[in-house]
Amino acid sequence: MAVQKSKKSRSRRDMRRSHDAIDGPTLSVDSTTGETHRRHHVTADGYYKGRKVVNK
């Protein structure tokens, strides 16, 4: 089993973890309705890329 020779300091541990943060979802504004939605997803009104794709 692998065992470290010396203990990693809190600073080294935290520097390694600095890239682990999660970003928020990427949002876009629909050109037709002006509604904010997630990228590559249909809006709540049923529009995708400016066209109506879901009929309610």
From Swiss-Prot:
GO molecular function: structural constituent of ribosome
Record keywords, A-Z: Ribonucleoprotein, Ribosomal protein
GO cellular component, one term: large ribosomal subunit
Pfam families (UniProt xref): Ribosomal_L32p
Feature: compositional bias, Basic residues: 1-16
Keyword Transmembrane helix: no
Biological process, per Gene Ontology: translation
Disordered: annotated span: 1-56
Highest taxon of the lineage: Bacteria
Family label: Belongs to the bacterial ribosomal protein bL32 family.
The protein's name: Large ribosomal subunit protein bL32
Provenance organism: Idiomarina loihiensis (strain ATCC BAA-735 / DSM 15497 / L2-TR)
Name of the gene encoding the protein in the UniProt record: rpmF
